[in-house]
Structures are given as C-alpha cells and as structure tokens.
Amino acid sequence: MLKVNYLFGCPNCNGSISVDRLHAGIPCETCLPGAVEKLDIRTIYDLLVKYSTLKGYSELYMDLEMYDDILRLFKKIVGGEPWSLQRYWLNKLVRGESFSLSAPTGVGKTTTLIVYSVYSHTTSLFVVPTKSLRDQICEKLKKIGHLVSCNKPEEDKVNVVTFHSINKNIDEFVRIKPKLLMVDDADMILKSGKTTERIAKVLQIPQEVFDDTIKMLRLKRMLRFKEDEDLINQVRELESKILGYKSSVQFIVSSATLKPKGYKQMALRFLVGFEPSTIQIYNRNVIDSFTYSNNVNELVKEIGDVGGLILVSKDYGKKYVDQITDNLNAEGYRAMKAISGRKFLEKFSNGDVDFLVGSASYYGVAVRGIDEPKRLKYVIFYGVPKTKLPLEDSLNNPLTALKIGELLKLDVTEYRKRLIYLSPAELQAVKIALRNKVSLNGKLGDLVEDLTKLKDIILDTIKANKIDKLVSDSFVIKKDTNKHYIFFPDIITYIQGSGRSSRIMNGGLTLGLSVVLVDDLELFDILNKKLRRIAEVTFMNFDELKLDEVREKLNKSRSDGSGGRSMNFKTALLVVESPTKARTISKIFGRGVRREIYGIPVYETIIIDDHSNTIIYTNIIASKGHLTDLTTEELGYYGVEINDKDIVVNYSPLYRCMSCGKTITKKVSTCPYCGSSMINSSEKIVNAIRLISTEVDEVYIATDPDQEGEKIAYDIYSLISPYNQNIFRISYNEITKTAVLNAIKSKAKINESLVKAQIARRIEDRWIGFELSSVLRSALNDNNNGTGRVQGPVLKWVVGKTSEYKANIGYVVDINIGDYVVRKFFKTKKDAETFISQLNVKVTKIAERTSTIDPLPPFTTDSLLIDAYSKFRINSSLAMKVAQELFEAGLITYHRTDSIHISPYGISIAREYLEKIGSNDFVGRSWGNEGAHEAIRPTRSMDVEELRKEIEENPFQFGIKFTWAHYRLYDLIFRRFIGSQMSSATATYTTYEININGELYTVELPTKVHGGFSSIYGIRVYNLDESHLTTRIRKGSLVSLLTYADVIRLMKDTNIGRPSTYVRTVQSLIRHGYVVESKKRSFLIATNKGQKVYEILNKYFSDMVSESRTSHLITKIDKINRNELSAEDVIMDLLNEIKNIKLVNPLQSEQYV
C-alpha cells in the first residue's frame, strides 16, 4: 500500500508524521501512541498531558480555551451567538493579533470590539471620530459594568476618546501605556502624518525605529530608479535594526477607506505588519437609473419620499451644493449640507433632516462617511460624477498625452514604444518630472524632454485647429471660457456613492435607488460602458420606472428586512500557487488589503456570491509552488521505504538558499552548494497557512488544475487537517470573477488518483535520475551531471541532429523568387558561386484551383510554443513564462493543456467580439469533447489594441510588467481563438513549375485568401514574381538543427512529453551543460559534454532511455491518473528496472574517456 510520510508537521512536536494521522487531526505516534482515530482537541490535549509529551499542541489548546471564554462573554453581553465574521475577529483578537476589521456597517464591528475590550482586562484605548460615538460606547460599557473612562486617560480602564483628544493630549495617553489600541475611522491616521506619528507613540514604537523605517522606505524608493551597492547595504543595515523591534501593543483598525500613502503612514504599516486600511466592498442592491432633467426638486417630488442624498459633481463647485440645499429648504423640505464633520449624519439619522447634499468626491464625507441603512434610500447625482482638470496639467500624464495625440492624428508610435515597457516606478518618475518641470538622467531624461515637446505640439495643434471638443473612449476635452479642460467620469465615486443607499441591515442588503442627472451625454456614455464591464451595472431610464413599486420596495427592505436581499456571511482561506495570482484575485473582488504573517504576504478581500447572497471574507495566500519534495535524507531508497506491505514515501520541506537560489530537500544549517547560512524553509509558509486555517470557516485550495497542482493541494490539505477539517479543492481554468465563484460553488475533494500518479512520476524521476546521474558523475568526474528518462530521448535527438549538421556543413544558396525561397546546398563556396553566376530562373503557372480552408483549432500548449517560435522567434522558455504571467493576470485561460475544447462561455466571448467589430463570420465551435481543461483562449473579448489602451489608462491593474513578448503572445492567442470561431476562408491555390538552371520543381502554393477567419488569423500567401529575384550565399548545412519547437513536436508525436514537461525537459539539459541554445535563432546544439553523456547512456542504458520505454511509462502514469492502474505496481516495476542500472557499473569494467 502506498503511504505518505512527512518528516515535519506533527502539530505537537513538529517531527515526522504519517498522512493518516494528519488527516485524523492527531499528533505523531511518538507523541500519541495508539490507533489512528479522530479525536477532539481537548481529548488530544489530555492524552498528551497523560503521556508527558505535550509540546506545541498546548498553543492550539490554549487558543481554543480563550476563544470559548470570549464566546461565553459575547453571548452574555450581546444575548446571542456571534456571526461568522464576528467569530473570525474574536479568534484573532484573543490570540493578540493586530489587524484591520473589514466589513460594511451593520455586521457588529463595534460590538465585537466592546466585548473584546471587556475581555482583555487591560489598559486600552478606543479612538473614535465623534463625541456622540464616544458617548454611545461609554454608555454601553457602563451598562456592562466595566471600568471605563471617557474624559481623561486612566490606567486599567477602557479609555474611549476622540481623535481631537488624542491630538490635544498625546503625552497623557502615551503615559498610560495602553496594551490595546482600537481605532475607528482610521482615515484620520491615514490623512494626517502628524496623527500617524502620534499613534506610533501610543503604540510605544521608539522614535528611532520609526525614523529608521521612514529612512529605509525612502532608500528603497531610490533603488527603484538605480542600482547602487551603497544604498543596498544601507537598506540591509536599517532592516536588521528594524526587524529586531516587536510591538507589545495590540493594534486594531476599523472603518478605513484610504490607502496609506505618505512615508509616515507607510512606516506605520511596515512596523505593525498590516495595512491600516479596510477592504472596500462594492456589493450593491441598487436600481441604477438616469434622466436628462436637471431639476432636483421636481425629481424629489416624483420619487415621493424623503431620505435622499444629493451628490453634486465636483466641477459645479460648492456654490451648487448651497443652491440645491437652499432650493430644497425653500420647497419645505429639511435639507442639510454634508461637507465636513459628523453633525449632519446625527441629524439625518435622528430624523431631523430629510435630505443631505454634498460633493461627489471620492474623498468627501458624503461619499465615504455615510452609513445610514434605515433612512438613506436613494442617491441623486447632480451631473455625471466626474473629474475636471486643466488640459495642460493632464498632459503631465504621458499615457493621457498619448491618447490625446492619437485623437489629434499625431504620430505617437515612437512615444508609445518607449512608454509601454516602463516599470510602474519609472512611469511615476516621468509623471513627477513633467509635473514639477525637473530633469532626469539617462533614458528617462531624454523621454521627459521629448514628452515636454509633445505637450507643446498637442496644445499648439488644438489652438491652430480651433478645436472646442474632443471625445475619446475614456474622457472628453471641452473648451470653457477660453481654456481647455479634460473630463473623466468618476467610476469609483459612482459605485461608492450610489452604494450608500444599499447597506447591510438585519442580515440583509437594503434596496437602493440611484438617479444620474445627465449633463454630458458623451461622459455618461463612457461611465455607462465602464460600469457595465467593471461592476455589471445596467442603467434604466428613470421615466420608465414604476415609482410606486420602487418606493414600496425601498421602504419594505428597511422595515422588516423582507424586501431586502438576505445576506449570509462566511470566512475562508484561499490558497493559490503564486503571489501574482493572489494579488489578481484580491483585485477582481474589490480593493483588498495586505497583511503579513511570519513575513508571508496575505491578501484580504471580500468575495460576494450574488446568486446565493453570500459574503465570503477571504484571506488569500500563495504557496509559491511546492511546499514539500521527496526527501534526500538517508531514508530507504532515495527517500522511499519499501517493506512487505507498504511503500512509504517520505517528504521534507523545501529549504531555499537565499544566496544562490538552490533548493535543498533535507535539513541543513548551511547551503551545500555555496556555504551560505541564509536558508529559508517552506515550513514558514505552512505555518502561516495553518494559522489562518484555525481562524476561518472553510479552506479552499486553488492550486493549478494539473498533476503538480493536485500534489501541492494534497500536501496543503494534509498539513492543515489538524487545524481545520472543512478543506476543499477548487479549480478554475481562468482567473476571472465568474470562474472563481463557479469554482467555489463546485468545491470538491482532492483527486487522489492524480496525487498517486504524481508520486509515482516523482519517484521514477528521482530513482532513474539519481542512479544515472551517479554513473555520469563518476564517469565524467563532474558534479553538475543529471538526467532522467525523458531527457534521454531528447538528448539523443539533439546530439543526433548536431552530429548530422556538422557532418553536412557547406554552403547554402537562397534563391528568393518574389517572397518564395528555394534553397540549394553545395559542399564548397566555389560551387555555390559558380551556380549563381550561371543562374537562370523561369517560373510558369500551370494550374489554379479554388478551395475552402477551415480555421485551425485554438492553441494547446505545444501548438502555442511552436507558433510563438515560428512566427516571432519567442523561444519556448520565454513563451511559457509569458503565458504563465498572462494567466495569472487573468487575461488567458490555463496555459498547460492538451485540450482544444472551448466552453459555451468561451464561445460567447468570440461572438461578443465579432459583433463588436461588425463581423458576420461568427460560427461558434466547441472543438471536441469537454475535459478537465479548455484550450488556451482569452478571458475577455478584448483584442491587443484594447489591451494596450487599458494598460495606458491603468498601468498597474494587471500586476505584471508588460513587454513586447506579452503583447505578441496575447495577440497570437487572441487571433487564433477568434479565428477558430469563424467561418471558413476561401483560398486560391496556384501550381507553378520552377526551372532553375535546368532543374524542374513543381509547387502548389496559396496565392489568394479572403473571407471568413482569414480577416483575423491570416494565412501566408505567396507571389512568385521572377522579376524580383535575389540570391544569397551563406554558410549552412544540408541538415537543420533542432529548435525548441521541433523538440516539442517530437515529444508530442512520440508521446514522451506533457504540457508541463515540454520546456522543463530542455531547460534541464541546458542547465547541466549538455545543450546550448544559439543566440540568433534559438537552435539547440549539443556540447561535447552532452555528446559524452549520450554515448554513456546509449552504450549501457539505451533501452531504459529509449522513446518507446519512456512513452510506455508515461502511458502508465496516465492510467494511474484515470484510476486504471495501481501506483504501487508501477513503483515496484520501476524498482526492478532500477536494479539493472545498479548491476551495470561501467566504471568497474572500463574507464570512460
């Protein structure tokens, strides 16, 4: 029986433990002798105490005890059970964690903090924005009978104070040395550097540490623009000083909407280990509408109810806020301005005010600071919410300048080429230099000079052509009182502002109404299109609404909750493979926040499933690939112990050397390769995942949907099972909102057949590789030798072609007849020259026919790699790296696939795109049967030019730095996919007879192609024009060398490769020095070392590394995948095969030279 054993991970001693025990949630046999059975935490604790083996498990037990204590207290104070989100917070609070409480109003943040402040029995500080909120909290604490101070700082009490008090009496609050600091509305910290510094003092952060952190952050920013060894050393020295600091104060942040931007704010974030900001939730239950009226009073009469928020577009200014407020009051309504402070909200909540009027500004209190679910029913936008800038100022953003230049028909191609590949830091430096009119050095300096000239050209062109208005797909430029301004629709302000009418109340989401008074048709059209794509908002004409029904629903959703949308809350941990993927998922569900656990980044976001009305508070962490590997400790046969009954496979954590980058699979204190003591263990990531798993309701493991991804998922599942039993495997083929939500809905268990197949393949790789490598090291006296079963045939092909190439070197004459090339080979240069001197070419058209051509299917991994090389000379390692990044950025589907199938959703993307460009050639093809994966396709109906525009508008949205290769590969994938969903093309094939110096050649070539898919995915056509005849002599061979593309095609044809191994196999040969890749054309050439290795393998182990034997083994692995073959049988067959290697030791019989 196949069994897995980890050499670490016991929840008590962190020692060796079997998978069976981990899955049962119990410690190792040394700690807890006896049969494997599921036991609860308290029983396990008691048994460990009984056996005197209690170690680390005590922490798990104590956390549970503290959690139970605070649950009892919560029920006593509140009179009911905490919600899922409150349980999550309480769990973290009792463990002393510092973090942000992210949730909409109405889910009990303040209640949770009041309960915890009572539970903590320590000097604490509760900082709130207003006196009224301070008084409310004080009153609640007094009713509970807890020690509370509301007027002056006192030790051993809960001190409830306003920010004003903190700023006024900072020294007194520092003096009481609170152990717990809770901050409501932390925007007060984030807006003011002075307040941030005062909060740092309350947190007892030494001034020197705070100043050093600011200095370190400044130096790191400088390093973005230039590599400087002195700066790097300064940063390292500061980091070593700062990292020794650990705060003794627990810091909790609630209700923050801003991101920390200043150096003081960023320093605070660095020192407390989390972002003092909270997740922005864009969940809405809103009727979005528009009208062309501009009369607010008339609109209010039509709605027929009070409880409205009027947001005035910023370009109208404070004057219109005053005017609208006065007009409403004159009509007999009670209206009040919402400009600053909090009094307006108190009056509105108490029913003393009917309407609030404020500015449609993202940072304004009317958009950010109003949470009144019962009374606020609708939002009226006076004018399309927009940002207005002087045109000249907007040109300091070079990407905006490019778009305006294009609108003016200026040639900005060269500017685009230089800008599009800048890093975010470089682009920011250029913006700042243009805005402040300062110079930069090097290429950025030249770019700033040229962009300054472009600004002048744009302004002169607009003036010379007397242009009053320009409209693009993202902004409008208009002339206003002899000056030009640029207007952008404010998408986020609309989402946030309209969302004020739809809040959490009594466990449900209230219904809201939004009405935009359209003052600019073009801007509204841009707003409408962007909202439809980003937030799935659809606007209705206000005049077509049945207002009596709307009014009834608005009120009903607030009276008894029955008319609102009922919401469920859940907490989860989502484990992915890469940090980029973690950031992408965090972004697509709103604006998340980042914290660190044991130095590992964790992204917090809120996933909202509208269909089940579930809010999933989600922590996202990256495993960074595999967390374990077959151990190289001296255990069994290369880590595998075999006895009569079982095959026990032993796994170690991965130890990565921070100096040389090597990975080690046994416990070491120094790197065996470079001697460095800077070793990082994957145990740190395991511990971070374990910690979060204790806090959440469910764990979703979303590693890649392939064999390797399943093994990573299995390791995570096994190692965290003692901490959470609600663990699910989810998988998706693309990183989009819909795909992730569907994956969560379809959560499943680990596919153990895939895991067993991976284990068998890894054992084969280890056994064959280590044994053959041992022979090669001895034979060649070189430690950098290694090979495996798949590398053997590939090395054979490369060595063979290299030998044939060298044996047939001569001269090649290229005869270019129009755009068709005929090649002739000669042994000597003289023969080639003679041939050219006598050259006589005659081309005769002898036949022509018309035929239809069907489109090619969408890409699989092998066909993508082949086309990337043949069309753009992108070698396969770069192509796979770029495809990985495009997948992780959410732009294409999973790129390791041998399926050509397209899902109905994929087909709809092609339909949408073809309709958008006005094509009638959509056909729609599913291309084969549905399987685990789809073909490689785009995730949106966005071509490469649209992608460029998106990146120009927001260079940071995809989280990767785009290069020419990213655009080329995306364009290739997009065109191939769209073409695969189109009708057939019509081609004309022409047959030619070519007479070259008396030799006759007959060829049939496509000479015309039109219609169908050819408009998107072009087919090469030829023009054999003998009047355009050129020749060239070059050194070459009768035999071509192999490229990556050739090797991939051979691997696929001989069934010795899979999408995940195509590139890795060749890279391994290059890494060992057996093969080199030519610089110009990426040919693969065998080295002398590679030749010697092949000769040894061919002489002694030819059968073992043959194509047929390798293909046979891969077929067996596939059968294990499908549960048609036992992994144990395959492993035992391998063991018998390995014995042949050990029996044949070439060094004992002869010395290889």
Swiss-Prot record:
Binding-site list for ATP: Q86, A103, P104, T105, G106, V107, G108, K109, T110
Ranges where the Toprim domain occurs: 571-735
InterPro entries referenced in this protein's UniProt entry, alphabetically: DEAD/DEAH_box_helicase_dom, Helicase_ATP-bd, P-loop_NTPase, Reverse_gyrase, Topo_IA_2, Topo_IA_cen, Topo_IA_cen_sub1, Topo_IA_cen_sub3
List of residues binding Zn(2+) 2: C657, C660, C671, C674
GO molecular function list: ATP binding; DNA binding; reverse gyrase activity; zinc ion binding
Enzyme active site: Y894
Any one Gene Ontology BP term: DNA topological change
Further facts: This enzyme is the only unique feature of hyperthermophilic bacteria/archaea known and seems to be essential for adaptation to life at high temperatures. It may play a role in stabilization of DNA at high temperatures.
Function: Modifies the topological state of DNA by introducing positive supercoils in an ATP-dependent process, increasing the linking number in steps of +1. Binds to single-stranded DNA, transiently cleaves and then rejoins the ends, introducing a positive supercoil in the process. The scissile phosphodiester is attacked by the catalytic tyrosine of the enzyme, resulting in the formation of a DNA-(5'-phosphotyrosyl)-enzyme intermediate. Probably involved in rewinding DNA strands in regions of the chromosome that have opened up to allow replication, transcription, DNA repair and/or for DNA protection. Might be a cell cycle protein.
Subcellular localization: Cytoplasm
Keyword Isomerase: yes
Gene expressing this chain: rgy2
Record text on cofactor binding: Binds 2 zinc ions per subunit.
Keyword flag Zinc: yes
CDD domains: SF2_C_reverse_gyrase, TOP1Ac
Name the record gives this protein: Reverse gyrase 2
Single GO cellular component term: cytoplasm
